[in-house]
UniProtKB/Swiss-Prot annotation:
Gene Ontology molecular function: wide pore channel activity
Assembly description: Homooligomer; predominantly forms a homooligomeric arc-shaped pore complex instead of complete rings of 16 subunits.
Domain of life, source organism: Eukaryota
Protein name stated in the entry: Macrophage-expressed gene 1 protein
Function, in words: Pore-forming protein involved in both innate and adaptive immunity. Plays a central role in antigen cross-presentation in dendritic cells by forming a pore in antigen-containing compartments, thereby promoting delivery of antigens for cross-presentation. Also involved in innate immune response following bacterial infection; shows antibacterial activity against a wide spectrum of Gram-positive, Gram-negative and acid-fast bacteria.
Taxonomic source organism: Bos taurus
Activity regulation, free text: Forms arc- and ring-shaped pre-pores on top of the membrane at neutral to slightly acidic pH conditions and converts to pores upon acidification. Undergoes transition from the pre-pore to the pore in a processive clockwise hand-over-hand process. In the pore state, 2 alpha-helical regions refold into transmembrane hairpins (TMH1 and TMH2) in each protomer that form in the ensemble complex giant beta-barrel transmembrane pores.
């Protein structure tokens, strides 16, 4: 017995020691253990992260990286994660070049050109909201300049991620949240979460990175100087190179006096200049190229990036715990969110600086540079509203209905046709005191009042009136711009209308400025070219199309007009058209970040999906009610689930079960009442029997006493 106790004690101590050691090992990150063991730094430039391909910025980590094997680069200089492999440059790859960028349209990023060239999405707007691009475009347009670039690039590694790498826990958790909404048919909430996913993880995933360093000089010189020197374009690039080498203290021999003279002319026509250092030693005036290059190995940064769209990595192989059909639906939802992000930030217009229709804010050309404007008449707007719930407490349609001032009703004047832009639902939450009568056994009743949260809902339908034929002059409204709660009127640079104009409500918070005063309001009027949205085109684009009511209209502006964003209403983009060249001043618009869809105020009662069948593979997935995890179902489980879903003759319906429960309750109450009654009656009978017994005993005692007295009288002592 003592030997058994001793063995048990030794086993317990050993188990405690092993447990304590394992805890200590997991307290420190894996890469810290590798650093302590190998005495090497960790490679700082890694793929596997998210990437916003509009802004050229890194976002959240998508692929999981671990350091359990303490792997290193092939040259043994850096520690790399288990999922990463590197391709070192066997020779020093130092590249120096000089180029001229005549137009911002041909812009190429210095550090993310490869991923910007990825063609699966709207590649024309890739990188157009990066700080680098917006600076170049603004300086070229405002200063009427062209750009020269001289750069030295030192490539050290190409770093790639294993295609079989797993998704990070945070990214997978976000995908699971979206899939849960999809499986319960909560489409709006799933769309909202997918747009949040794009906000947090970007549009792409980086799969390859070039690690190294670069030193870049960027000059802006007057366009006239380049035009006067067409025969000497090489001299312009040479002058840019000479200027750069002077800055980095590179000694060179001046061979030609003409070159020196041309360089001075180059410097006199320079309007802006800057030098950027990516990696290597921080740049300072007078730094030598040799000193900068020697510091590259200790200061690596990403010099170029390549990758694939975010939704490409949402597949059944990476999400084995979800049914295949649900994963495909999840991928499509995320893809739609990414494409919506691109579409909202696409600004079509004229990109030719020499055209009178040039649109400074446009980032894609729509062919409007050569278009001639046609005068269109504006027939006004109106909005219909129907409230579905909550109308006894909250009147939603009072703030949503809008009559057309030309007719005094929700209609278009003669000669104009209504164009329905959008139909949407407006929701508002409110608290309401609700009282109900609650009874116990249908006898004991009381009134209970609760302050409950309810959602009032109303449907609104927005229309604008387009001329359907020839209309008389001055028959419509003057258009004076528009604004919303999140945007200003470009005509007034404020959330207001010009003098003499009134506001017309459209959608939930859009204000359209209009006027009937052709004498005083004409000087503020803007040539108007129609509305269009994600659900409706613009009938003014083609007169033949507008006359054919059966043909859908194109979602664009007529020739000579440029489109501008009116608002994004619950994920739907609404645009309006004004004369090209207007509303194009100021600064470039900032990126419009998601989410664009409004989440529901109160989720409806969700259907708890427990079974998903893939008809292509004849397999079915079952959701475990305890763990809420999906798994492939066994035949017995499938039959049981099908009985639950479809029902059979063995079970009871909800009404039958409720009736049976009520019947059993009443029967039990009756049994209890009878038992109480029987017990009371039994006690009463026992009491009466006891009294009778007492009385009979008393009577017997009296008779016996009389007999004894008589006997004593007959026999005196």
């Amino acid at each position: 017995m003592n030997s058994f106790r001793g063995a048990f004690l030794i086993w317990a101590v050993a188990t405690w020691a092993e447990t304590d050691t394992s805890w200590g090992a997991t307290d420190e990150p894996g890469f810290q253990n590798c650093k302590n063991a190998l005495k090497l730094p960790v490679l700082p430039v890694l793929p596997g992260g998210g990437w916003d391909n509009l802004r050229n910025v890194d976002t959240g980590r998508v692929m999981e990286l671990a350091y359990s094997h303490c792997r290193t680069t092939e040259d043994g200089q850096y520690i790399v994660p288990d999922e990463i492999f590197t391709i070192p440059q066997k020779q020093s790859n130092l590249e120096m070049n000089s180029k001229i960028l005549e137009s911002w349209v041909n812009y190429q990023s210095s550090t993310s050109n490869s991923i910007n060239m990825e063609l699966s999405l709207f590649s024309k707007v890739n990188g157009k909201f990066s700080l680098e691009f917006q600076r170049i475009k603004t300086l070229q347009v405002k200063d009427q300049a062209v750009t020269t670039q001289v750069q030295v690039r030192n490539l050290v590694y190409t770093v790639k991620i294993n295609p079989d790498a797993e998704l990070s826990l945070g990214f997978k958790k976000a995908l699971m949240d979206i899939s849960e909404q999809l499986e319960n048919n909560q489409t709006r909430m799933a769309t909202y979460l997918a747009e949040l996913l794009v906000l947090n993880y970007g549009t792409h995933v980086i799969t390859s990175v070039d690690a190294g360093a670069a030193l870049i000089q960027e000059d802006h010189i007057r366009s006239s100087f380049l035009q006067d020197s067409q025969s000497s374009r090489s001299a312009v690039t040479a002058s840019a190179g000479i200027t750069f080498l002077n800055i980095v203290n590179f000694k060179f021999e001046e061979n030609y006096t003409s070159q020196n003279t041309f360089t001075k002319s180059y410097l006199s026509n320079r309007t802006n200049s800057r030098v950027q250092s990516f990696g290597g030693l921080p740049f300072y005036p007078g730094i030598t190229l040799q000193a900068w290059q020697q510091g590259v190995s200790n200061h690596l940064v990403a010099m170029d990036r390549a990758g694939l769209p975010l939704y490409f990595f949402i597949n059944p192989e990476r999400l084995p715990d979800l049914p295949g059909p649900l994963v495909r639906k999840l991928s499509k939802t995320v893809e739609a969110a990414v494409r919506r992000y691109y579409a909202v930030n696409t600004y079509p217009g004229c990109t030719d600086l020499s055209s009178p229709n040039f649109n400074f804010q446009a980032n894609t050309d729509d062919g409007s540079c050569e278009g001639k404007m046609t005068n269109f008449s504006f027939g006004g707007v109106y909005q219909e509203c129907t409230q579905f719930s909550g109308n006894e407490v909250v009147q939603l349609c009072q703030n949503l209905e809008q009559k057309n001032p030309l007719t005094g009703s929700v209609s278009c004047p003669s000669g104009y046709s209504p164009v329905q832009l959008l139909t949407q639902t407006h929701e508002e939450g409110y608290n309401h005191l609700e009282c109900s009568r609650k009874c116990t056994l249908y006898i004991f009743c009381k009134t209970v009042c609760e302050d409950v949260f309810r959602v009032a809902r109303a449907e609104f339908r927005a229309f604008w009136c387009a001329a359907s034929g020839q209309v008389s002059e001055n028959s419509g409204l003057l258009f004076g711009g528009l604004f919303s709660g999140k945007s200003i009127n470009p005509l007034t640079n404020a959330q207001s209308c010009p003098a003499g104009y009134f506001q017309l409500k459209l959608f939930e918070n859009l204000k359209v400025c209009a006027s009937l005063d052709y004498e005083l309001g004409y000087r503020f009027s803007i040539p108007f070219g129609g509305f269009f949205s994600c659900a409706a085109g613009n009938p003014l684009v083609d007169s033949a199309t507008s006359k054919d009511l059966g043909a859908p209209s194109l979602r664009k502006c007529p020739g000579g007009f440029s489109q501008h964003l009116a608002l994004i209403s619950d994920g739907c983009q609404v645009s309006y058209c004004v004369k090209a060249g207007l509303f194009t001043g100021g600064s470039l618009p900032p990126v419009r970040l998601p989410p664009y869809t409004r989440p529901p105020l109160m989720s409806q009662v969700a259907t708890n999906t427990v079974l998903v069948t893939n008809h292509e593979t004849a397999s079915s997935w079952i959701k475990d009610p305890q763990t809420h995890q999906w798994r492939l179902g066994e035949p017995l489980e499938l039959r049981r689930a099908m009985r639950v879903v479809h029902g059979d003759g063995e079970g009871l319906s909800g009404g039958a079960a409720a009736g049976l429960t009520l019947g059993v309750t009443i029967a039990l109450a009756g049994v209890v009442a009878l038992a109480i009654y029987g017990a009371r009656k039994s006690r009463k009978k026992g009491y009466q029997a006891l009294q009778d017994e007492k009385q009979s005993l008393a009577a017997g005692a009296a008779v016996n006493g009389d007999a004894l007295d008589q006997e004593q009288a007959q026999n005196p002592a």
